[in-house]
Amino acid sequence: MSNQSLSSKILGGNLVLRIAVGLVLGICLALVSPDAAKSVGVLGQFFVKSLRAIAPILVFVLVMASIANKEVGSDSRLKPILVMYVLGTFVAAVTAVILSYLFPTTLELVTSPEGLAPPQGVGEVLKTVVFNLVDNPLGAITNGNFIGILAWSIGLGIALRHAAPSTKVMLNDISDAVSFVVKVVIAFAPIGVFGLVAETMATNGADAFIGYARLLAVLLGAMAIVAFILNPLLVYWKIRRNPYPLTITCLRESGVTAFFTRSSAANIPVNMGLAKRLGIKEEIYSIAIPLGANINMAGAAITITVLTLAAAYTQGIVPDFSTAVLLSIVASICACGASGVAGGSLLLIPLACSLFNIPNDVAAQVIGVGFIIGVIQDSAETALNSSTDVLFTAAVSMSDEKNN
C-alpha cells in the first residue's frame, strides 16, 4: 500500500502544470540570481543524463515487443486505412522538412562540442547508416547507436512473432517495466526543466527563448498545415466531396479531448464513440482506432523532424534535399515507435540525429528543449495524432460505402 502511495505521489498530478511552474521558477531565478541559476543547472544536467541513459533500452525493447506482438488483421478493408496512416505520417514529416528549410531555427544549448564533422551528402549518410546497422547489439545499446538498435530490435521482433505466447507475454512485461521507468524519469521533468531553463537563461540571456518561440511557431505551423490543409486533401482523395465537415467534427470531438489528456491511448474510447456515431462498422473501427493510436503519428513525425533539423542547424549542418527526404522516412518510422510512452517522440530524437553525426549529448539537450516547449507542443501533437485516427478511418469507411 505504501509503495502504491509513493508511486502515485511521484507519477501523479498534472505534469503540464508542474512543468509550467518549473519553467516560470527557472526564469525567475535566472533574473534574480544568475549565479544561483547556474548552480542549479546540475538538476537539468542530471535530467538530460537520465534521458540519455533510458533512450537506447527504451527503443530496443519497445520496438521489439511491438513488432513481436503486432497482430494486424487480414481484413482487406484495413489495408486502405493503413495506407492512409502511413501516407499521412510521411506527408507530415515532409511538411516539417519544408517549413524547417523556409524558417531555419537554431537553439541556445548549454554546451556544444567543437570540431563536429557533418556528413557530406546523402552518400555519406547512407554509408554511416549501413555500417551502423551491423553494429554489435550490446555495443549499439551501450554507445547509443540508434540505427543499430533499431535494426536489431526489428530483426528480433520479426523473429519473435513466431515465438511461444509465454515469450510474447514476457516481452510485453519487459516493455511495460521499461515504460514505467520512463514514466518515473519523465515525472521529474519539472525539476529538470527548472534547472535547464535557469542555466540556459543565466548563460545565454533572453535570446534563448526567442529561439524557443520560433521553434514552437514552426512546430505548430506544420501541425496546423497538416490538420487543416493536407489531411483534408487526403480525405477528399478518398471521399470525393467536401472534407471539412468531417475534418472539423473529428478535430472538435476528438482533437480537443486529446489536447488535454495528452495521450492517444487514453483517447481511444473517445475515438471509438465518435466512430460509432459516424456510422462506421464496429468490426472496422474496433481494430483501426487502436492500430492508429500506435502507428498513425503525424504529430510525432513533425516533432522529430523539426527538432532534429533544429539540432542540425545549431551545429552548422545544412542537410541537402536527399538527406532531408531520408530524414522524413526515418522520422516516420521513429514516430510509429512513439506511442504509449510519455515524451515518446522526444526520446526518439537521438535516433534521427544520428543521421547527421550529431552527438548524443547534443541530442539529449534538444530533448530537454522539447520538454521546455512541451507544455504546448505535446498537447498539439497528441490532438493531431488522435483526431487523424478517426478521420482517416471514417474517410475510408465512407469511400467503401460509396463504392459499394
Curated annotation (Swiss-Prot):
Keywords, alphabetical: Amino-acid transport, Cell inner membrane, Cell membrane, Membrane, Symport, Transmembrane, Transmembrane helix, Transport
Reaction it catalyzes: L-serine(in) + Na(+)(in) = L-serine(out) + Na(+)(out); L-threonine(in) + Na(+)(in) = L-threonine(out) + Na(+)(out)
Residues spanning the membrane: 10-30, 53-73, 81-101, 140-160, 177-197, 215-235, 287-307, 329-349
Pfam families: SDF
MF-aspect GO terms: neutral L-amino acid:sodium symporter activity
Membrane topology, record value: Multi-pass membrane protein
Main location: membrane
One GO cellular component term noted in the UniProt record for this chain: plasma membrane
One annotated GO biological process: threonine transport
Cell compartment(s), UniProt: Cell inner membrane
Cross-referenced InterPro entries: Na-dicarboxylate_symporter (IPR001991), Na:dicarbo_symporter_sf (IPR036458), Ser_Thr_transp_SstT (IPR023025)
Similarity section: Belongs to the dicarboxylate/amino acid:cation symporter (DAACS) (TC 2.A.23) family.
Its biological purpose: Involved in the import of serine and threonine into the cell, with the concomitant import of sodium (symport system).
Name of the protein in its database record: Serine/threonine transporter SstT
Lineage per the UniProt record: Bacteria, Pseudomonadati, Pseudomonadota, Gammaproteobacteria, Pasteurellales
Gene: sstT
